[in-house]
Amino acid sequence: MPQTTPYSSKFNPSAYSSSHSHRQPVEENYGGLHYRDNKLVSGSLEALIQLLVPTVDYYPDRSYIFTFLLSSRLFLNPFELMSRVCYLGVDHHRVGDPQMDKKRIRDIAPKIVQLLTEWTETFPYDFRDERMMRSLKEMTHRLAFGDELSRRAMQRLIQRLLRKLTTLGQYEESLATTSAAAAIDRPVALKSKQQLVRRDDCVLNLCDDPFIFAQQLTHIEMERLSYIGPEEFVRAFAQKRPSDNHKSFFSKRKASNLEAYVEWFNRLSYLTATEICMPVKKKHRARVLEFFIDVAQECFNIGNFNSLMAIITGMNMNPVSRLKKTWGKVNTDKFDILVHQMDPSSNFYSYRTALRGATQRSSTAHTSQEMIVIPFFSLFIKDIYFLNEGCANRLSNGHINFEKFWELAKQVSEFLSWRQVICPFERDRKTLQYLISAPVFSEDELQLASYESEGPENNLERDTRRSLRSSLSRM
């Protein structure tokens, strides 16, 4: 049988490059699987499931395991897949002779344990489903019938999994608590602006070192990235298809960590704009503006493109961009370069070039700081979305389009390599707490703060300010 995957030990983009020769590709079929030039390109769901299941003399390629576990949830619930794996891996081959069954289980058990280890370590959130956990425990009992070592390995596997799920639950509770506290403490009207300017936790009073501030942003980014499960990328676009047969499964899940990460980007943008618009005096606003430009530069140097883009987005919001007198006191050369780096023209060509450079640096890194790559996340999601929209999940013959899912897995696996890096910077707890919980202005409050800082320039702006004052004073 041809190799199961176009990659050996990792996902290799060259597997998708076109050949320089003009020969016809070699097409082959094996039991419901279709190969082109020795690469799996499509197959029936049942054949792909069977390819996942180890036998005594076969174990699937790791990149195939990842790709199929990632994409299969578009076609069947993970619990259904687990049931099929249990049946095909153990129950299907029982012959009714206790001794022969015990020997076979003993022979296959290490590979079943290995497969379940990869599943629980890469997709632990699948096992928040009680049925999945129950199946895992049942498999432990089945393997114990033939092999004590495998039973112990399964017990250790379950213990590691439970620790991961406990940590996830604590993280989600912490996010919910922080969000609730920020909502309660949030200023509800601009009449409190003067008091907020003088608050002790004003950003420059708290931390006036752009490098340290960028480090703390990187801590938050990397922590939130680390909790995003790879399956969330599939779930994100699966929910957009009303005809999906497993919509009910996807909709049962809580708000995803992916969504929480996108919300963090929005929060940082609004926090940046709030801090710039808040000071009453022009020179103070200019200092804050310069500070955030320097923070953005440090984020770029670190490889934290998500915080960089969030800060630029905040600075480009109308309440900030219209402060011409404030901008006039700032040297914008550095800012202009950063804006160019994140310019959306030519499909973010400049940013993608910088990202490739950061990725290359990470692959040859000598220090943990050089390993950091935090992509502009909204664009990363957009790329996956267009990959999904541009290719069908199934071919006309009913086969699953596995070429599409190789490409999806390649993109998501790169994300996983970025996600696993440990942030090397020292934590500044006060700055971290400020970043995640400091009150921020709403869009209307920002606009009014901007008008109060630098007055309206025309009748339309004067009318807008009057309307905002009236509406916010009633809150």
Curated annotation (Swiss-Prot):
Biased composition (Polar residues): 1-19
Domain N-terminal Ras-GEF stretches: 36-166
Keyword DNA-binding: no
CDD domains recorded: RasGEF, REM
Coiled coil feature spans: none
Annotated InterPro entries: Ras-like_GEF, Ras-like_Gua-exchang_fac_N, Ras_G-nucl-exch_fac_CS, Ras_GEF_dom_sf, RASGEF_cat_dom, RASGEF_cat_dom_sf
Protein's name according to its UniProt entry: Ras-GEF domain-containing family member 1B-B
